[in-house]
Every structure is written in structure tokens, then in C-alpha cells.
């Protein structure tokens, strides 16, 4: 983040060049406060044309809440690899119900150090935040106990996801 912060302050509206994220060219902000050097996400929003509306309606007419959206690979309780097929309804309800069980609101911040390629990070992390309007905080590229705890403190996170081995590492 310091590298991004430095470039944002010194780069008026042109592509960024970051050593750790060479493919990242633009950073967009969400919210009411403009940030110099960054583009507002609202600038990407367009009024849909009739052609786009028709295209969306065609896709919607062929979708069902019970259609498969994702195959989550797992070893489950047996230890044998398999694909668990999830539907739109599975994933959205899971995110919504867990956000309600956690009593998360737009005032909360959830630290998500778990991998996004797993249901824990993607559904119980991202979708919980989307369903509740809370803020998703990603402490780093991969799990590091010290970085995670520092991020929780600095960002004033009100929730922290993890598995037992992660919490043990944080306690050590």
C-alpha cells in the first residue's frame, strides 16, 4: 500500500506502475470523497442502452436460482478430492445468512486472511461483506500471522476469519 499511496500522490490520472502488481494500471475509489490521482468507480457506470437491456433480459430468462454457478473442489471429510457443485441460491443465501448470524452491518470491517479460492474466503468472506454492506479487509497476498494481527489493529476490524491453525499461529 505505501507504493500505491506514493504513486497516487505523484501520478495525476495516468496508469500506475507497481513492482508487486505489474498488471495493475488503475485504482478506483468508491465513496463520496474524491481522491487525487484516482478515478471514481461511479465514472465507470453507464446508462444501459436498449440493446444491453435486451441482452440482460435474454440471459436472465435462461437462469434459475437453482442453476449451478460454481464447483468448489474439496477433500471434505473423506480426504478424497471431489467437486461440490453450488447453486446461485446456495452461495447467496450462505452469504446473507452468515452476515445476519454475525450481525454485521455497514459499520463493520471483516479481516479475510483465508484464501479466496475456497468457500470460506469467497462466500463467507466476500459475500458476507456484500450482503451486509461491511468492509472487506485483505491483510496480504497469503497468510502471515503478524501481518494479519497488525492489519486487524490498524484497520480496526470488528471480525476476523480463520481456521484453528491460523488462530494458533496468531497466538504464538
Regions found by a protein language model. Give the residues of each.
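Conserved structural elements of the adenylate-forming
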Residues: 51-53, 65, 70, 84-105, ...
Amino acid at each position: 500500500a505505501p507504493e500505491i499511496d506514493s504513486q497516487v500522490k505523484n501520478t495525476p490520472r495516468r496508469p500506475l506502475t507497481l513492482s508487486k502488481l505489474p498488471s495493475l494500471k488503475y485504482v478506483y475509489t468508491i465513496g463520496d470523497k474524491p481522491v487525487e490521482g484516482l478515478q471514481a468507480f461511479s465514472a465507470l457506470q453507464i446508462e444501459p442502452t436498449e440493446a444491453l437491456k435486451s441482452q440482460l433480459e435474454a440471459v436472465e430468462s435462461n437462469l434459475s436460482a437453482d442453476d449451478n454457478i460454481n464447483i468448489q473442489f474439496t477433500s471434505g471429510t473423506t480426504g478424497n478430492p471431489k467437486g461440490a457443485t453450488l447453486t446461485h441460491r446456495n452461495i447467496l443465501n450462505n452469504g446473507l445468512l452468515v452476515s445476519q448470524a454475525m450481525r454485521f452491518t455497514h459499520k463493520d470491517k471483516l479481516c479475510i486472511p483465508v484464501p479466496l479460492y475456497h468457500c470460506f474466503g469467497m462466500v463467507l468472506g466476500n459475500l458476507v461483506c456484500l450482503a451486509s454492506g461491511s468492509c472487506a479487509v485483505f491483510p496480504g497476498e497469503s497468510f502471515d500471522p503478524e501481518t494479519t494481527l497488525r492489519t486487524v489493529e490498524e484497520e480496526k476490524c470488528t471480525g476476523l476469519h480463520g481456521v484453528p491453525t491460523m488462530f494458533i499461529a496468531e497466538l504464538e
